[in-house]
């Protein structure tokens, strides 16, 4: 998660990044997560977990765990598929109905990812009535090299408030591609047009 203080709230999620198995933090998180699941006696099925790394020590600290797949209506599934050729939902189905296929799955994503996936949430930095979503900016978004799809959670006429949680996002954009620097640039562009006034959002 890309979380940071925003609009007076201390822990606002701006986006998500798909992490490859070659990153050093993966071993730490995998070991810690396994310990948590064992302690909770969650032995069957998928789980979703949020873990923070303590400043300074880098020690993992549990925020939450759910006995389910990662949420977000599965919007991330195609991002995972492009990054490593599989996703948690399909792996869970294999566990239930195809033991042979499940047994072939590696314990974590490959070290070398085929693509560098991101989800970028579209934040509001101003409250009021959403007069419009600028079509020209939407065209710029869909033309981004790493663009893979988007969804708006609001429409013209809606009352909006500055984003402080997942219930006040304006939308989400899927990004993916082999060029990580390009994905980072596109991610930064989305942050900019969401914050600009006027930008993506035309708020009265």
Positions of predicted regions on the chain:
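Protein kinase-like catalytic core scaffold
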Residues: 61-64
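Active-site "cap" helix and flanking loop/linker of ATP-utilizing ligase/carboxylase catalytic domains
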Residues: 27-49, 66-132
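Residue-level preference for beta-strand/loop junctions
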Residues: 43-45, 59, 167
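Short beta-strand micro-motifs enriched in acidic
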Residues: 52-56
